[in-house]
Amino acid sequence: TDYIIMVGAKPRSKGMERSDLILDNAGIFKSQAEIINEVCSEDTKIIVVGNPANTNALILNYNTPNISNKNITSLMKLDHNRAKSILSDKLNEKVENIKNMIIWGNHSITQVPDLYNCHVNNKMVNLDHAWIHDTFIPKVQKRGGEIIEYRGLSSAASAASAIYDHIDVLENGSDDTEAIGILSSGEYDITSGLMFSLPLNVSSSGYSVIEDIDIESSIAKLIKASESELKKERDIVKQFLP
């Protein structure tokens, strides 16, 4: 399989808002999409890493009609890895024993790490609601910004590791719930036509959205907030969407 990893984007620097990045990168990704559409085979797989990754991936999706929508994904594995690591520390358990962690929505501070369906060593995780909402969720959401605050730069090594994990899942499949940004089609009442992180089953032959997950009510509200953010981002770049 041929892969294109879209790492390059105007970087987010200290004090910069995500909204500042959107239009700066939209034109870049449209021009890259046009070249990709012209020269790449239809089964090429494209992973968008450069932020705002979901909306950059949306621009690629709209401007590469020769490539399957399912082959264009945005990186959410970094958030997935962070969420598992934070829960691992809390429970003093190995990361590999944590299953069914979900990340919903955008790769931004509105992302929704959801551990209400998590299992550790085949047992349902049962943690205090206050810790989940006051500590766990904000810690995952803000981790990228914290690293920029400390280093003045984003987390390159962690992102590289997450890209490797993302490709490994696409190539070899996974026995766990995966978090990948894909083009939404109305699942869980999410607006169609957004690049949205959804819970997936992934095999070496493809992926499918896991249906009928019971979403805790407070998580559902957060998912709607992330959806709203992605709709606003889509509106900002609508001139780049044919």
Residue spans for each PLM region:
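Short hydrophobic/aromatic-rich motifs at helix boundaries and adjacent loops
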Residues: 5-7, 28-31, 55-59, 135-140, ...
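Conserved residues at the C-terminal ends of beta-strands
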Residues: 7, 75, 104
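Gly/Ser/Thr-rich beta-alpha loop segments that engage phosphate groups in nucleotides
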Residues: 10-11, 52, 107
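Structured loop/turn residues at beta-strand edges in well-structured enzyme cores
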Residues: 1, 42, 96
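Rossmann-like NAD(P)(H) cofactor-binding subdomain of soluble oxidoreductases
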Residues: 17-85
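Surface-exposed alpha-helical segments enriched in charged/polar residues
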Residues: 6, 34-38, 168
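C-terminal substrate-binding/catalytic lobe of Rossmann-fold NAD(P)-dependent dehydrogenases
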Residues: 64-70, 79-242
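NAD(P)H-binding glycine-rich loop region in Rossmannoid oxidoreductase-like domains
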Residues: 1-22
